[in-house]
Amino acid sequence: MHKIVLIVLMLITGISMKAQYPGYAPVTDLARFRTEFAAASQKTISIKSDFVQEKNLSMLSEKITSKGKFWFKKESQVRMEYNHPFQYLMILNKDKVFVKDGQKENKISTKSNKMFQQINKIMIDCMQGTALNNVDFKTKVFENKNTSLVELVPVAKGLKELFKAITVVVDKKDFSVTSIQMLELSGDNTIIRFINKELNANVPDALFTIK
């Protein structure tokens, strides 16, 4: 079980934490941003996207690049399907997690695994636009002409043991997530970029089925 948790953390975590973000300035009207972000998120029922993940391990000089497909559907359903350079599948469906690595399959309940519960909540909050309401983080918001950057610094004990910071970049046109970045305590650095996004696309429930 511990090995599976570490594998998922490696797949969806990373970034280097910076006191400032080049090209960004603090949002002057945070209340307005919260309102617009929440309103746009309410209209987003589903997301279909490709993704590119780049992971920099502190012990290696070269980055590891992975590609795959991503689906999100309210409420609380996420599917990440890695197809290059390896095959890997992760499904988050409410309080259940399914992981398939080659021929190995694992089903985990977030109710019985606090670490997976935290990972699950982070992913869902990012997609549903509720990250600013998560009391487990201290939040700051920055912006440039085209995007807004939400910085999440963990204050809850469990999360502080996993991450230094998480940043979520959203497109100002529709407030959809364009990238998620995280910094592990180990210094490993990862960014997941979402491309070819389709909002409110037809996403079958069967994609999130955990048998």
Question: What spans do the regions from the language model cover?
Answer:
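Short beta-strands and strand-coil junctions in structured, solvent-facing domains, enriched
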Residues: 58-59, 79, 86-89, 106, ...
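Flexible, surface-exposed loop/linker segments and immediately adjacent secondary-structure boundaries
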Residues: 108-147
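Sec-dependent N-terminal signal peptides
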Residues: 4-13
